[in-house]
């Protein structure tokens, strides 16, 4: 009880920050990507130059799902031009945005795989802080009032030991000053890892989510957070479930996105 009080009390949190800074000076933590020194003022495991050098997603993509366009002339001719996927099957979410390209070149995909399968929850939290840094620029100010991570099945959570989406979502909610809800959206069944075509992925997650606390969602502008947007099947199904429970709108934010 005493330790918990000390950790939750403002003085306890301040002491923890000072202790962490002192430990960093004595035993500096290297960047998980390059091994270089980290800024002790930032609670991160990825240095600024490495983050800046990752394959970033810039402006110039589908205004709905954020899919990058190879030819910038597409948006120049029609700023509201939606990609073929969004025109063929309009998504239930308002917009989706991501920070990194999910590909081997540049390190985006290896970074995500290391976070998910390398037993590195600290890396997920650090990347969540980087996502929080960019949330306003990518999503707009005041666009959500509740953050919900895509849940794992109980079996997958036991195997991995953590839900990377929840660890990414925590810093985003904290920076925005809104609640993080990790209990309302839940998996109704374990699903195999997402592979194959868009249709196969959609079938794999159809009906895989449910709301445990619908009243918590009703009327809220929800930010749905996940690690990777590939075809969008998982976040589409999650968004449908949230909207069926009465969410006012759903915005999607992922660490990475497949081209």
Predicted regions and their residues:
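Glycine-rich phosphate/pyrophosphate-handling loop used in enzymes and phosphotransfer proteins
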Residues: 1-226, 230-259
């Amino acid at each position: 009880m005493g330790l918990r009080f000390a950790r939750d009390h403002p003085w306890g949190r301040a002491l923890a920050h000072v202790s962490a800074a002192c430990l960093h000076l004595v035993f500096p933590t290297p960047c998980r990507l390059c091994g270089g020194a980290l800024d002790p003022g930032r609670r991160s495991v990825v240095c600024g130059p490495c983050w800046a050098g990752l394959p970033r997603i810039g402006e110039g993509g589908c205004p709905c799902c954020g899919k990058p366009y190879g030819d910038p002339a597409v948006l120049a001719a029609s700023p509201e031009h939606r990609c073929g996927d969004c025109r063929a099957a309009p998504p239930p979410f308002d917009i989706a945005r991501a920070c990194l390209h999910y590909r081997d070149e540049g390190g985006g995909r290896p970074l995500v795989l290391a976070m998910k399968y390398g037993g590195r929850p600290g890396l997920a939290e650090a990347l969540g802080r980087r996502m929080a840094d960019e949330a306003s620029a990518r999503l707009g100010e005041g666009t959500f009032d509740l953050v919900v991570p895509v849940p794992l099945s109980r079996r997958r959570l036991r195997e991995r030991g953590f839900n990377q989406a929840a660890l990414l979502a925590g810093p985003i909610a904290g920076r925005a000053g809104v609640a993080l809800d990790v209990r309302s959206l839940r998996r109704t069944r374990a699903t195999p890892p997402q592979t194959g075509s868009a249709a196969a992925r959609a079938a794999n997650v159809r009906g895989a989510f449910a709301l445990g606390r619908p009243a918590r969602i009703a009327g809220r502008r929800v930010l749905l957070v996940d690690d990777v947007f590939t075809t969008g099947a998982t976040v589409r199904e999650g968004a449908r479930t949230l909207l069926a429970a009465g969410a006012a709108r759903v915005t999607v934010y992922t660490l990475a996105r497949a081209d």
